[in-house]
A protein has these predicted regions:
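Helical "lid/coupling" subdomains associated with nucleotide-phosphate turnover
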Residues: 9, 47-71, 75-76, 88-93, ...
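Short flexible coil/turn linkers enriched for glycine and charged/polar residues
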Residues: 5, 15-18, 75-78, 104, ...
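A structural preference for short, hydrophobic beta-strand core positions in alpha/beta folds
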Residues: 83, 112, 296, 511-513
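N-terminal glycine/serine-rich phosphate-binding loop of ATP-dependent small-molecule kinases
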Residues: 1-10, 14-20, 24-85, 99, ...
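Gly/Thr-rich phosphate-binding beta-strand-loop-beta motif of the actin/hexokinase/Hsp70
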Residues: 2-35, 132-165, 220-221
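Short coil-to-beta-strand
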Residues: 32-42, 163-170, 322-323
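Low-complexity, glycine/alanine/valine/leucine- and proline-rich hydrophobic stretches
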Residues: 460, 464-511
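Short, surface-exposed alpha-helical segments at coil->helix boundaries
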Residues: 92-99, 491, 495
Length: 516
């Protein structure tokens, strides 16, 4: 019987190796209970990574399993659900047909998440587990490595800030499918695979430099296999292992042949084939950065789906903490391209004052506020490439960067707003201008118009305005800027840039200086 004031929620994950559902009754992030778990093995990864298509037989199998899941959802009285698909579906050329069949046969809507969003969802779950375990990054940082069937996410966290984040297409199943069977059985395979992995993750080594961390946090689908081989309880939420013990384990694994692995660890051949890629990948990752302790968590992608859903519904404190971590990542990206931090922070501060005054009336909420902050921080990073036409390079750099927590559409909005804060929208004479899809025009225009005004208020890059208030009355946005400095350049630039804001919002911006 459902508890009073509790909501029943189903999280469904269509992964590369497993189709899973978790049904939960929740009141908030502290008061919830998982009441049903279903896991059905499907081998999408092996088919998709090699042939880029999901066979018809698997499509039918997926739909049959989901029909069963729907019956369970009805029995439990599920009121809310989120269904997400990851790597295998994301890369399938027949993705559209799969999603259409799922919807027509089950009524379920599937959100296909991109890799940065996938890594972020896992990051949220792991972060929550480590906080419960009192694992802190205040003094000594941690490097989080999530390995899935099709990808690898590497995140460096120090002082509760994301200092580095990178994602790579080298998951365990993908590695296995990258080499034909006769190559995997070659006596040269170990060396070739080691060199392949080393060259692939080389950029991470360069980015991390001489960084040191206390904790190396491992998660992902293959950690269950690792725990089994280490003789540890797979059901336990967190395992802590000394780095030296981990290295010793890998040394022993590297010496074993496939038949020996099957015999010693009682593994099926198809599972034993994954051991060597797993061991060699972990070994390469361990060499990236010295760590004193290895932490292995049992958190799955589906746990992240659940936590994000419940947190967004019930926990504003958690939402704020997660937002601040994303802001730290935006600044990390800005610093990589030698941005002017003081200018970025000033533009962000002034933009938010304007945004908070007009957001509700113009259909903007918390998510648009986050995208605005990202735009303010990153709008000038193109100057790292070239001072002339820097906005096109800002657009290209943002589009080329993985930003966990932002979807591809979110990232495109930030990139476009960064470009159009300095360029005219719908300028047909500008052949280099990135195209804006029709449905994105309103949000891109609104964010770009706000950043354009705020940028004008710091045109000198000298942060002359130390405080600012905004009033909105009779379609006039009055900006009262407090400063003891000469604001002539800012006033002139504000007047030049205000036309676009007026076109977008139907509000006339007026700047008044206040001597304070």
């Amino acid at each position: 019987m459902k508890r009073k004031n509790y909501t029943t929620f189903a999280a469904i994950h269509l992964g590369s190796e497993m189709l899973s559902m978790q049904i939960t009754e929740y009141h908030n992030t502290d008061r919830y209970k998982v009441i049903e778990c279903c896991n059905r093995r499907i081998r999408l990864g092996e088919a998709t990574f090699k042939n880029k298509i999901i066979p018809f037989q698997l499509v039918s199998e997926i739909c049959e399993i989901l029909i069963g899941f729907k019956r369970l959802m009805k029995e439990y009285g599920v009121e809310e659900y989120v269904m997400q698909a990851t790597t295998a579906v994301r890369e399938a050329s027949n993705q559209v047909f799969l999603l259409d069949q799922i919807y027509n046969k089950t009524g379920l809507v599937v959100d296909v998440v991109d890799m940065p969003k996938e890594i972020y969802t896992k990051f949220v779950a792991i972060r929550n587990t480590l906080k419960a375990e009192k694992v802190s990054t205040e003094r000594e940082g941690m490097l989080m490595m999530d390995i899935s069937s099709g990808g690898l996410g590497v995140t460096l966290v120090r002082d509760e800030k994301i200092c580095y984040q990178g994602n790579f297409h080298i998951g365990i199943i993908r590695i296995k499918e990258s080499f034909e069977r006769n190559r995997r059985e070659s006596m040269h395979f170990n060396k070739a695979l080691t060199e392949f992995l080393s060259s692939t993750i080389g950029p991470v080594r360069n980015e991390l430099g001489d960084s040191k961390v206390r904790y190396l946090v491992l998660s992902g689908t293959e950690t269950e296999l690792l725990l089994r081989m280490l003789g540890l309880d797979e059901q336990q939420k967190v395992h802590r292992i000394k780095a030296a013990d981990f290295h010793a384990f890998f040394d022993s694994m590297r010496q074993m042949s496939l038949p020996q692995l099957i015999q010693v660890y009682k593994l099926p051949e198809n599972v034993a084939e994954l051991v060597l890629p797993t061991v060699l990948l972990y070994e390469q990752l361990l060499h990236l950065i010295p760590a004193k302790e290895i932490i292995i968590t049992a958190d799955r992608f589906i746990d992240g789906i659940q936590l994000l859903h419940i947190g967004n519904k019930t926990n504003p404190v958690m939402r704020k903490e997660l937002e601040q971590e994303l802001i730290s990542l935006f600044h990390t990206i800005g610093a990589r391209y030698l941005y002017d931090k003081k200018h970025a922070q000033q533009v962000e501060r002034l933009s938010l004052i304007i945004f908070d005054k007009i957001a509700k009336a113009y259909g903007m909420g918390e998510h648009e506020r986050l995208l605005l902050r990202a735009t303010c921080i990153l709008h000038d990073i193109g100057k790292y490439i070239c001072m002339r036409s820097h906005s096109i390079y800002s657009y290209q750099l943002i589009m080329s960067t993985d930003i966990i927590g932002l979807s591809e559409v979110d990232k495109e909005i930030v990139a476009l707003a960064s470009y159009y804060h300095a360029n005219r929208l719908f300028d047909k004479t500008n052949t280099r201008a990135p195209q804006v899809e029709k449905e994105l025009v309103p949000v891109v225009a609104k964010l770009a118009a706000i950043v354009r005004l705020a940028d004008a208020l710091d045109r000198s890059y000298m942060q002359k305005i130390h405080s600012c208030t905004v009033t909105l009355k009779d379609n006039k946005l009055k900006v009262l800027a407090a400063s003891k400095e000469d604001l002539t350049l800012e006033i002139w630039t504000f007047d030049d840039k205000s036309t676009f804001f007026e076109e977008v919002f139907g509000i006339e911006p007026i700047l008044e200086r206040v001597n304070k």
